[in-house]
């Protein structure tokens, strides 16, 4: 396949949006996933089949079929942004597009591979793939307003895929969908109250958009309840804590590092993330056996230490020193981050029946 840089040069000469080089993979960038398709196909849905069938019926209605239609508000909107705001906004669009496209690829492949053996599950994944493709295409089109786009075909063929067992897919995608809901709805509500901070018309679409994320999260909630072992027992409690911490820490460190984007929207990145983390943690108690104690004063103190360590790691990378010297400079900060994450993981969690007794 032709590398994206070569395509970019051809695109510039033809007046089309340039194809943007994918960002380098790091611990903070969206990942592409694959799983054990045979195990997924063999899943017995009977413990919660009624709820899954009801969710599938909701998917069939495709409430947002006509929602993602660009209008005249997009005309010239990109030209109104200053260079720095353009830069951080394009970064946001790229990260969001990559994340949505990652979901599309996983759901589409699942729907295709399990269709014969588990048609209900396959249909649900097909509907979610439809939604994710729609989101990714809409975001990529918005990037085109700024003169660049992602080559999604190139990403499909060249991105590294991480293998997760099905239950890990459940934890990771459930949290991704639910945290996506709270991120989008928080931005939408803030901009409704502060319209002068609405830097681009794509935010007008976030209210309906986030309902897709919410429905997808509800599907994984129902699927985990159909596989009770995924949310029962000591092992499940430990894995739920791990994924909650991994998702929350990754988001917090990433968003603080690109706080300029949130400042452009009139938001404080730290306060925004604290709100999203609190709401996602609360929502997760509906299905996870335990959640994190995010109100403990040490929780954000330790995350801030990780932010500081990551800044030091970035400075080491940019120092111009030789590779061995950079490695030696970075080792203490990697170790410090590992220690802080271990302290966060082993902090006492909150049992979900105590957190949301009425719901559970």
From Swiss-Prot:
Keyword entries, A-Z: Chlorophyll biosynthesis, Iron, Metal-binding, NADP, Oxidoreductase, Photosynthesis
Membrane-spanning ranges: none
Pathway: Porphyrin-containing compound metabolism; chlorophyll biosynthesis (light-independent)
Catalytic activity, as annotated: Mg-protoporphyrin IX 13-monomethyl ester + 3 NADPH + 3 O2 + 2 H(+) = 3,8-divinyl protochlorophyllide a + 3 NADP(+) + 5 H2O
Record bears the keyword Ubl conjugation: no
Enzyme class: oxidoreductase
Cross-referenced Pfam families: Rubrerythrin (PF02915)
Enzyme Commission code(s) on record: 1.14.13.81
Cofactor (UniProt): Fe cation
SUPFAM superfamilies per record: Ferritin-like (SSF47240)
InterPro entries: AcsF (IPR008434), Ferritin-like (IPR012347), Ferritin-like_SF (IPR009078), Rr_diiron-bd_dom (IPR003251)
Gene Ontology biological process terms in this record: light-independent chlorophyll biosynthetic process; photosynthesis
Region (Disordered): 1-20
GO molecular function annotation: iron ion binding; magnesium-protoporphyrin IX monomethyl ester (oxidative) cyclase activity
Stored Gene3D superfamilies: 1.20.1260.10
Origin: domain of life: Bacteria
HAMAP family assigned to the protein according to its UniProt record, in alphabetical order: AcsF (MF_01840)
Recorded family membership: Belongs to the AcsF family.
Role of this protein: Catalyzes the formation of the isocyclic ring in chlorophyll biosynthesis. Mediates the cyclase reaction, which results in the formation of divinylprotochlorophyllide (Pchlide) characteristic of all chlorophylls from magnesium-protoporphyrin IX 13-monomethyl ester (MgPMME).
NCBIfam families associated with the record: AcsF (TIGR02029), PRK13654.1 (NF010172)
Protein name from the UniProt record: Magnesium-protoporphyrin IX monomethyl ester [oxidative] cyclase
Species this chain originates from: Synechococcus sp. (strain RCC307)
Organism taxonomic ancestry: Bacteria, Bacillati, Cyanobacteriota, Cyanophyceae, Synechococcales
Gene field: acsF
């Amino acid at each position: 396949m032709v590398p994206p840089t070569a395509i970019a040069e051809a695109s510039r000469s033809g007046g089309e949006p340039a194809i943007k080089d994918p960002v380098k993979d790091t611990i903070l960038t969206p990942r592409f996933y694959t799983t054990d398709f045979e195990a997924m196909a063999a899943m017995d849905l009977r413990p919660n089949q009624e709820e899954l069938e009801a969710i599938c019926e909701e998917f069939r209605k495709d409430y947002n079929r006509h929602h993602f239609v660009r209008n005249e508000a997009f005309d010239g909107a990109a030209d109104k942004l200053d260079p720095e705001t353009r830069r951080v906004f394009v970064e946001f669009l790229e990260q969001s597009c990559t994340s949505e496209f990652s979901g599309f690829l996983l759901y589409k492949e699942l729907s295709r591979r399990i269709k014969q053996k588990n048609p209900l599950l396959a249909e649900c994944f097909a509907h979610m793939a439809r939604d994710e493709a729609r989101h990714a295409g809409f975001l990529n089109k918005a990037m085109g307003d700024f003169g660049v786009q992602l080559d999604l075909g190139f990403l499909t063929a060249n991105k590294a895929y991480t293998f997760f067992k099905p239950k890990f897919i459940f934890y990771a995608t459930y949290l991704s969908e639910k945290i996506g809901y709270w991120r989008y709805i928080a931005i939408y509500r803030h901009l409704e109250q502060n319209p002068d901070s609405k830097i681009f018309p794509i935010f007008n679409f976030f209210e309906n958009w986030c309902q897709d994320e919410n429905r997808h999260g509800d599907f994984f909630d129902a699927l985990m309840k159909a596989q009770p072992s995924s949310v029962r027992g000591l092992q499940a409690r430990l894995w739920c804590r791990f994924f909650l911490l991994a998702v929350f820490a990754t988001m917090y460190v990433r968003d603080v590092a690109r706080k300029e984007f949130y400042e452009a929207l009139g938001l404080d990145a730290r306060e925004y993330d604290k709100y999203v983390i609190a709401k996602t943690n609360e929502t997760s108690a509906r299905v996870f056996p335990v959640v994190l104690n995010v109100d403990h004063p040490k929780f954000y103190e330790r995350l801030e230490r990780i932010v500081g360590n990551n800044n030091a790691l970035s400075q080491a990378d940019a120092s111009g020193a030789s590779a061995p010297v950079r490695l030696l400079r970075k080792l203490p900060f990697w170790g410090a981050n590992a220690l802080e994450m271990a302290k966060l993981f082993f902090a006492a969690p909150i049992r979900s029946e105590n957190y949301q007794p009425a719901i559970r």
